[in-house]
Amino acid sequence: LLSEAGDLTPAYFEVRKIIEENFGKLPELTVKNSPKKAYGTLELTERCSVFDAAKMLAKPVHSAAPQFMEDIGQYYGYTLYSTVVDGPRDEAEIKFDAVHDRAVVFIDGEYKGFYERTRDGEPVSFSLKKGENCRIDILCENMGRVNYGPKIMDRKGVKSVRFNLQYHFGWDMYPMPLDDISALEYKEQTGEVKTASFLRGYLDIDDEPCDTFLRLDGFTKGIVLVNGFNI
């Protein structure tokens, strides 16, 4: 009955007509469809990597094992789990006892794969020679909660990380609910973006603001904030 923009569609008026034919006249509408406008291409000229952002937005919580978001005082948004692994280490797959809801894995800042709660992801394996080490970062996203049924007490985040069958201990966790990102410090963006990042651009509107739509060609997964508000 309503479009994606909340506009009244022909189907709405047909349903309204049928209701009036059977139950009498309805009150007159006082709403109108909103004006729309195309504002062209928005250049994202500034960037802050998620690894830098975590240190700007959160105080790290250290724990032997990864904790759920609720256990570190967080309820929405993202948590970055970070650890350093020393070699030597034979080829090992990163595994989780629980992923709620999407975990993206980076090794030394480079994207390697993702895990999801409800579908197959891209499992990640790694190996280290003697004297080598690497930093493993896991960016976990809370993708929403249900408010009914057996999963109503749903916890978010990751729990118990293993390399094959061996549990790994010693983690720093950075809670990022993203309700306030004003502390972020951006740098000029040059070249291709190769890791998870906050990107910023500016849209100047001289006349009365209109509704518009975002088309995110080339992007994969993320969120959009307008003047700091997560839409």
Predicted feature descriptions by range:
Residues 73-106, 112:
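The feature marks the first
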Residues 91-106, 136, 203-227:
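Aromatic-lined ligand-binding clefts that engage carbohydrates, nucleic acids, or primary amines
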